[in-house]
Amino acid sequence: TRFALVSWARRCVSETAIKLEHEISMLDENEKKDYLDLMNMDEPVLNKIIFEGYKMLGLKTFFTAGPNEIRAWTIKNGFTAPNAAGVIHSDFERGFIKAEVIDFDDYIKNGGELGSKENGKLRLEGKEYLVKDGDVIHFKFNV
């Protein structure tokens, strides 16, 4: 039947797209860029799906960074700095003092926290600060 044919075609297209996305994910950055350019794409479809999903669900990502690890945390739109701190640990929210915040692009451009601080890109935010997508945050707290 026509429905069965359409259903089969959708499955095949989906399976092919999934395989292509997997292959793209296995490429090094230069090969990935060349492949995406060849396909006239600016980024993998999976990135777009994740981004749109976050928008639809009202979610944002902020980062914490230490000497050996950078970690992404998911929060809801409208979270204040103490709310975001609470995602890491309830003590962080309860004892929140302030947040040291760097915009993600500034963090990358300045080579991390130290360079951002030296170039005046680190700012102190209080309890009312609404966390922005991509903020790199170091929470100060006391419990």
Predicted regions and their residues:
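C-terminal-of-GTPase-core extension/linker across diverse P-loop GTPases
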Residues: 14-132, 137, 142
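Single conserved hydrophobic/aromatic residue that forms the stacking wall/gate
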Residues: 1-12
